[in-house]
């Protein structure tokens, strides 16, 4: 499996606080990786480092065996596509115009089938003439996801399998569209894309990801297949809650959270 993105002892400090602490990871073509962890663990900071939006205080990041810093912004956009957690939605463009932005400088005629395909896959074709600010939060999220899919398709047509980064992509979506989004991401992984998604819903993560990376206090504390990674002890330690863990027929775990019980000021069991 060819590595798409690798980090080597990556650390990020801001104002004396260590947000990411000595991260070593490698994600290859065809992997669907979910990053999970509590709020403030460093997940979004790590994703911004992988996207090139932030530069690490220490360590090195390689995208397709080249230093991430060696890519220009234009080059980077053809090798990785990112759906950020917070996207500016005040500009008065239509859904179709937003999705077409993913094609960059590609001619409109050439981009047209990619735009149509992405809108169909994300089920936003009926919204194509609507201006973005008039949509619900979930509809806006799906529009931006379609834009990112177009960007990814354009880049992979030129350079082969790329990197898809998703920062809490399901946060504004109802259950149906949460499942559809992660299934779409999974299809990209099966076609060779390296997919890394921050997911807060552990059941979504363990059901659809082939690999789980658990971040706690800026460091990786677990990394592996869902059935081996998500354990009762890890849930207690990292998330400070109890959960009954059951298993699907394929061995993937299902988490059934228990009511939280206080064991002292600021502590939960």
UniProtKB/Swiss-Prot annotation:
The keyword Protease does not apply. Keywords: ATP-binding, Cell inner membrane, Cell membrane, Membrane, Nucleotide-binding, Translocase, Transport. Residues 5-242 form the ABC transporter domain. InterPro entries: AAA+_ATPase (IPR003593), ABC_transporter-like_ATP-bd (IPR003439), P-loop_NTPase (IPR027417). Pfam families: ABC_tran. Its EC number is 7.6.2.-. The keyword Lipid biosynthesis does not apply. It is found in: Cell inner membrane. One of its GO terms (cellular component) is plasma membrane. ATP binds at residues 37-44. Its main location: membrane. PROSITE patterns: ABC_TRANSPORTER_2 (PS50893), HMUV (PS51261). One of its GO terms (molecular function) is ATP binding. It comes from the Bacteria. It is a peripheral membrane protein. The complex is composed of two ATP-binding proteins (HmuV), two transmembrane proteins (HmuU) and a solute-binding protein (HmuT). Belongs to the ABC transporter superfamily. Heme (hemin) importer (TC 3.A.1.14.5) family. Part of the ABC transporter complex HmuTUV involved in hemin import. Responsible for energy coupling to the transport system. This is Hemin import ATP-binding protein HmuV. It comes from Nitrobacter winogradskyi (strain ATCC 25391 / DSM 10237 / CIP 104748 / NCIMB 11846 / Nb-255).
């Amino acid at each position: 499996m060819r590595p798409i993105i690798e980090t080597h002892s990556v650390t990020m400090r801001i104002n004396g606080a260590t947000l990411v602490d000595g991260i070593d990871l490698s994600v290859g073509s065809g992997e669907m990786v979910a990053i999970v962890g509590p709020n403030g663990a460093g997940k979004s900071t790590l994703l911004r480092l992988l996207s090139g939006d932030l530069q690490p205080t220490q360590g090195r990041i390689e995208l397709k065996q080249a230093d991430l810093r060696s890519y220009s912004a234009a080059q980077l956009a053809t090798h990785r596509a990112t759906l950020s957690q917070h996207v500016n939605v005040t500009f008065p463009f239509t859904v179709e115009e937003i999705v077409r932005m993913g094609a960059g400088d590609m001619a409109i005629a050439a981009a047209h089938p990619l735009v149509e395909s992405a809108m169909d896959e994300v089920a936003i074709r009926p919204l194509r003439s609507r201006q973005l600010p008039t949509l619900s939060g979930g509809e806006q999220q799906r529009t931006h996801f379609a834009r990112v899919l177009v960007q990814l398709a354009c880049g992979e047509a030129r350079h082969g399998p790329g990197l898809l980064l998703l920062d809490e992509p399901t946060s504004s979506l109802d259950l149906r569209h949460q499942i559809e989004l992660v299934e779409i991401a999974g299809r990209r992984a099966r076609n060779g894309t390296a997919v890394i998604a921050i997911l807060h819903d552990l059941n979504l993560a363990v059901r659809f990801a082939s690999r789980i990376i658990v971040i706690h206090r800026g460091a990786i504390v677990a990394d592996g297949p869902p059935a081996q990674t998500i354990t009762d002890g890890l849930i207690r330690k990292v998330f400070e809650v109890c959960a009954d863990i059951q298993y699907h027929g394929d061995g993937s775990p299902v988490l059934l959270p228990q009511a939280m019980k206080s064991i002292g000021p600021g502590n939960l069991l």
